[in-house]
């Protein structure tokens, strides 16, 4: 157990018996009241966001974790098969662990898997940005390229992304895996 004041963003704690990652932690001292920490956390089992107020003197159970890089190989049913780059061991990661960012997984991409002290998978950290090829989008006319609207595009992983009108089939784009938003076109 450690004091809440020693915990920072990105720490994984055991809260109400389940692992939670701290997404933000703010120390507050309002007027005549006692100080507290306002924490926004994400439950790593269910994916739900939780807000909680910890008193400044409260202790929490920090989970000892290990982060290891793994390479994505293929999808097997509802699991993703990942390979340890050093030992070549393969593990299956349930789709629910990756969440919505799994729609941008493509062969050979490197992810970081977070293991708890008992060896179970707590989280999978995707790269923030991935480069994917647009496989299908509606053709544009000269008038469309002059406007600043967006259109739907299907990328090589099967995900749909809103892209600017000038993007055509075969273009390579950079996408934010956290939000699924188009960032920029990549020069070939």
Curated annotation (Swiss-Prot):
It is found in: Cytoplasm. GO terms for molecular function: translation elongation factor activity. GO terms for biological process: peptide biosynthetic process. CDD domains: S1_EF-P_repeat_1, S1_EF-P_repeat_2. InterPro entries: Elong-fact-P_C, NA-bd_OB-fold, Rib_uL2_dom2, Transl_elong_fac_P/YeiP, Transl_elong_KOW-like, Transl_elong_P/YeiP_cen, Transl_elong_P/YeiP_CS, Transl_elongation_fac_P. Coiled coil: none annotated. This is Elongation factor P. It comes from Chlorobium phaeobacteroides (strain DSM 266 / SMG 266 / 2430). The lineage of its organism: Bacteria, Pseudomonadati, Chlorobiota, Chlorobiia, Chlorobiales. The gene is efp.
């Amino acid at each position: 157990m450690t004091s809440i004041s020693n915990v920072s963003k990105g720490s994984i704690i055991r809260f109400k018996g389940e692992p939670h990652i701290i997404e933000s932690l703010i120390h507050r001292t309002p007027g005549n009241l006692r100080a507290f920490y306002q924490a926004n956390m994400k439950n790593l089992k269910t994916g739900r966001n939780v807000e909680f107020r910890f008193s400044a003197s409260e202790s929490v159970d920090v989970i000892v974790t290990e982060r290891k890089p793994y390479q994505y190989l293929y999808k097997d049913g509802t699991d993703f098969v990942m390979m340890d780059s050093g030992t070549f061991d393969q593990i299956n990661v349930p789709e629910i662990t990756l969440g919505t960012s799994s729609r941008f997984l493509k062969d050979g991409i490197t992810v970081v898997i977070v293991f708890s002290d008992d060896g179970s998978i707590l989280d999978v950290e995707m790269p923030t940005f991935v480069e994917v090829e647009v496989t299908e989008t509606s053709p544009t006319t000269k008038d469309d390229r002059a406007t600043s609207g967006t259109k739907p595009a299907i990328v090589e992983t099967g995900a749909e992304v809103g892209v600017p009108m000038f993007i055509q089939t075969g273009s390579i784009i950079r996408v934010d895996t956290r939000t699924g938003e188009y960032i920029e076109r990549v020069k070939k």
